[in-house]
Amino acid sequence: MHDDQILLTWVPRLRRYARALAGNRDDADDLVQDTLERAWSRASLWRGSGEVRDLRAWLFSVMHNLHVDGIRQPKLATVLMDDDTPEVAVAPTQGERLAVIDLQGALDLLPIEQKEIVLLVALEDMSYADVSVTLAIPIGTVMSRLSRGRERLRALMEGRDEPVRLKVVK
C-alpha cells in the first residue's frame, strides 16, 4: 500500500473526530487537512524509521495538538453556511434528531479535557492506553476525566445542572 493510501484510510475516522471537536464541517475539514499535511511532511517518522509505532495514535495526537493550537490562536470570524445538511443517507426521526442535538449541546458544555477523552473512547473506540499515548497524559488521568465527563454528560442529558455527588461517610 502506498503512503498516500495509508493516510487516506484514516480520513473517515479523523474527520469524525474533527467534526466532534470543531463542531462544524468546515472547521473539521480544515483540521483534517492540516493533520494530513503535517503527517505527510513528517512521513519519515511513520514510514520506515520506526519512530512512530502506532500511526493511529500519532495521527490523533497531531490532530489534538493542532486543535489546541487553533483554540489558543484568535481566528477571524467566518460565516458558516449549509452546516445543517445531514450526512446520513437515512433521515433520522424527529426524536433522534432532537437527541443528537441535545447530546451535541451537552458535549459542548464539557471542558475540552473531558470532551476529547469521551469522544476518543466512545466515538473512536480507542483504548485507555491509546488515549493516554494520543494526549500524552497518564492513563489514570484518562480514566478520571472519562468518568467525570460521562457523569457530567449524564447529568446534562437528565436536565440536572450538576452531577450527583456521593456523600463521604465517616
Tell what function each PLM region has.
Residues 14, 28-39, 62, 131, ...:
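Short, small-hydrophobic-rich alpha-helical interface motif
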Residues 117-121:
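A short pre-motif secondary-structure segment
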